[in-house]
Amino acid sequence: MRTFEYRVYPNRAQRQQLMACLSESRSIYNEMLAALQAQYEADGTFPSKYDLNMRFKGRGGEHVPATTVQMLSDRLSKALKRALQLKDLGLPVGFPRFKAANRWHSIQLRQYAPSRDVWMDADRKHLHVPAKLGRLLKIKLHRPLVGTPVTAHLVLRADNHWYALIVCETLPQDEQGIVHAEQVACDHPPIGLDVGLKVFLADSEGDTVENPRHYRRGQKRLAHAQRTLCRRKKGSHRRRKVAREVACKHLKIARQRRHHHFTVAKHYAERYSRICVEDLNVVGMARNHHLAKSIHDASWSAFLVILTDKAERAGHGVIRVPARFTTQKCRRCGEHVQKSLSVRTHLCPHCGLVEDRDVHAAKNILQTGLTEVQAGAPPSGTGQDAAPEELRSPRL
């Protein structure tokens, strides 16, 4: 599954219809959650998705399409199921929350097909949606759709612009003309990557990618806007205006970071047959409060997900190796050389090897990854894109 995001341009009347649907769908979702909680408190059971659909049938009125109401029950059921799964794993998790206006930004449309909920017009410049949402929305297809569209979301971002997120079901890789990694291994060399904070990553060929530090670069302007937000009276028009400015700054940082991830991932995914990376416990590493902000700013996990997906589409593979001792172990003699984070050069007292710390770790990762491949371990991968994420806005 792949998700394609396109900008839509509703006129004034259509924007009012979309905002009305957004507000009313949030109210219906909260009513569903209240009914779910009431039944659980009464007899200790949860209503099924079918029960919620039947109970709220026709609740959409003149603002919310019927299929969108059905998707609300599906959304609540998935949230509850995920919460119960995390609880079974012993993780601290709460009950699904009631949604405030600043935590509700999307409208889900169920079926993408002609004469259904949503489909593309023949001119490729307009998107057909239900009449309650404006019927015909202007859209800009800056890139072609790949695969078979299945469903769609209309999302209001923090920049106050509407976007259409079209989820497509892609064909198997072989049917798209993509070959397996074993068939292209002779044409593209393998490589090891070591992600870090001083540099975003270093590879086993000695090259490094600078860490852009998008959040830290924009932190001063963001802090100024947040202080201004704190001085505004809650509920006032001036506070809402500054809150939108803060949200736009966060959105810009997120987009800059994501663009950087895609650029770097594409470079390595297209040029190397096997990409060896560390299997990092990012959650545990972020518990170090001296490094947590920098780790989240680099967003290694998001980068590795993008890298894995792009490598799969190029017919290549990503191999995750244990992160233990990749920095401390000397790649030439195998002895352990203890060093703190402040030591940026690997200097082995046993064999005399001197090398940049990050490049040395990348070469260790490559050696370990190739050893696992020879032992028969398959390359790791995701195979699917994550669901569209909603960016949070400050509380108004």
Give the label of every model feature segment.
Residues 1-396:
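Nucleic-acid substrate recognition interfaces
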